[in-house]
Each structure stands twice: as C-alpha cells, then as structure tokens.
Curated annotation (Swiss-Prot):
One of its GO terms (biological process) is positive regulation of metabolic process. It comes from Pseudomonas putida (Arthrobacter siderocapsulatus). GO terms for molecular function: DNA-binding transcription factor activity; sequence-specific DNA binding. It is found in: Cytoplasm. GO terms for cellular component: cytoplasm. It comes from the Bacteria. Its main location: cytoplasm. Residues 231-252, 282-305 bind DNA. The gene is xylS. This is XylDLEGF operon transcriptional activator. Residues 214-315 form the HTH araC/xylS-type domain. Regulatory protein of the TOL plasmid xyl operons. XylS activates the xylXYZLTEGFJQKIH operon required for the degradation of toluene, m-xylene and p-xylene.
Length: 321
C-alpha cells in the first residue's frame, strides 16, 4: 500500500536501534516489550505525531521483531499493514496480516505480534472515551461491558477511511488546528469505526427526540465548571434520581456522575492542547473544573487518555516552540 501517512516532518527515528524505537513507543503509543532475532542488526524507523487526543504513528523495526503487549487499558489501536506482513496471535487464533488489512486491538486485548523484516505499520491510538462519546453523539447504546470490536478487518470495509487518515495526517503536520477541529476529526474516525466495523454496539437510536435527556446534556455542557448535583439534573429531567440513572444508562451507557466527569476531563484536555488557552498550571485548571483532589484528578485523566495532564501540556508547548 502506497499512501502518504506522516512524512519527514513527523520523523523521530531513522536507522535506529529497535530498543530505542520501542522505548519511545512505550511512552506515547502503547505498553509492550520486544524480542529481537538472534542474528542481524535491525534498523528501525518511526514517525509520530500527536493530534488532539489521537496518537498517529508509522513504524518499522527493520527486522523480524516480536512485540508482546499486556493490553492498552484505556485505548484502542488501529494497526494498518502498509508493507510486509505481521503474524497476530490472540483469542486462540492466529493470522498473517498483509497490506490492506487492519488489526483492531481493544483496551483489554493482549497482543502477540511478529513483524516480517519488511513490515511497516500505521497505528492510530484512540482513547476509549472518544468512542464512548461517539456512541452518545450518534444516539447509540454502549454496552455495559464496554465497546468491543473484532480483531480482523479489511480496509475495503471502510470506504474512504484511508483517505480520511491521510487528511488527518496532513492536518496534523501542516496546520495549527484548533482543539475543536481536532476533536471533530477524532469523532469522525470513531463514528466511522462504529458504523462500518463489527462491534457489540447497538446502533438502534435510543435518545433521538428525548427532550429530557437532551435538556440534561445541554445543562451539563453549559455548566462544566460548576458543581452539578444529581438532584438538579433529576429536577431538569422531571424524574426521580433512580429514573435519571436509568436514563443515562440507556442513552449514554454510563452513570450521570461518570458522564459529567468525562466531559470535564475532555474539556480540560482541549484546553491543555490549545496554545491560545494560556494555561498557567495544571492545578489551576483542575480546580476551575471542580477537581479538588489533584492526585485523583491526574489518575482519572490518565485512565481516560493514557497520559498525565502534564504530558499533554508539555507536548503542546513543545509543538508551539
């Protein structure tokens, strides 16, 4: 497959020792370990770009490297084979992925992958909160156990998807996109995956035309920096607290408290990724949104996005510099 997905502007390593590439990937893309072949001196290459909540990565280890991951915890991996092949083992199965195929790893999927010497991949790391949000935005029902996809897919299932990724890469490398634009692209990718790939999400429309739910969600969006009580939400929805829980479980796949917390975290991340926001400190913005326990805030943020808020802010300042 010959597609321009990240160019020299995003180059991190070329002719590099595979362990150096692996260390970088562990920091930004996903926890794993590698095993090198006994003979030869593989030379790895890596391109990487952060685009809002997405990590975009083009990687080649330059040798028959085995990659083992215990799981991604809070993120999904889309791995598109560009060159060579990759042997995947999981769920008691194995398959040789070739160019034109896509491997999709769920947050709790363990991965055992063996690259061919000429294998090159393009990887998108997508936080689970983005897919949860896409479910809510499209009025689809998220299963209680979380969204899960099958592992094996063909890009022909995703009409125009590779062109969308090319557009995202171009946007990431050539423009200073506003956080809203970055969030929009991430939402499109998530919706595209949910719409066109097999998953356990029911796309039956639940909340369309439900004025109570829409009224509550709008109130939350307008008051993210305030302390929002469940009693106030129940009053707005004109129902009991128990019915409010059922409403959120049905239309958002989570509790009102978790929904509010996730929206606060998403808003904070957008600010940290926005150079024009002039964020002075993590503590200040956390307190602005009502997170009084800073240690718990940092842990919630990392669970949602796979990195600490200080990492997000540092990367934003690095890109501006």
């Amino acid at each position: 497959m010959d597609f321009c997905l990240l160019n020299e502007k995003s180059q991190i390593f070329v002719h590099a020792e595979p362990y150096a590439v692996s260390d970088y990937v562990n920091q930004y893309v996903g926890t794993h370990s590698i095993r090198l072949p006994k003979g030869g001196r593989p030379a790895g290459r890596l391109h990487h770009r952060i685009f809002g909540c997405l990590d975009l990565c083009r990687i080649s280890y330059g040798g028959s490297v085995r990659v083992i991951s215990p799981g991604l915890e809070t993120c999904y991996h889309l791995q598109i084979i560009l060159k060579g092949h990759c042997l995947w083992r999981g769920h008691g199965q194995e398959h040789y992925f070739a160019p034109g195929e896509l491997l999709l790893l769920n947050p709790d999927d363990q991965a055992d992958l063996t690259y061919s010497e000429d294998c090159e991949k393009f990887i998108v790391k997508l936080p689970s909160v983005v897919l949860d949000r896409a479910c809510s935005d499209n009025n689809w029902h998220k299963p209680r156990e979380g969204i899960r996809f099958a592992a094996r897919h063909n890009l022909q299932q995703l009409d125009g998807f590779i062109n969308l990724l090319g557009l995202v890469c171009d946007e990431a490398e050539h423009t200073k996109s506003m956080p809203r634009v970055q969030e929009h692209y991430a939402g499109i990718i998530a919706s595209k995956l949910l719409e066109m790939l097999g998953s356990n999400v029911s796309r039956e429309i639940f909340s369309k035309g439900n004025p109570s739910f829409e009224r509550v969600v709008q109130f939350i969006e307008e008051n993210l920096k305030r302390n929002i009580s469940l009693e106030r939400l129940a009053e707005l929805a004109m129902m009991s607290p128990r019915s409010l829980y059922n409403l959120f479980e049905k239309h958002a796949g989570t509790t009102p408290k978790n929904y509010i917390r996730n929206r606060k975290l998403e808003s904070i991340r957008a600010c940290l990724n926005d150079p024009s926001a002039n964020v002075r400190s993590i503590t200040e913005i956390a307190l602005d949104y009502g997170f009084l326990h800073l240690g718990r805030f940092a842990e919630n943020y990392r669970s949602a996005f796979g990195e600490l808020p200080s990492d997000t802010l540092r990367q934003c300042k690095k890109e501006v510099a």
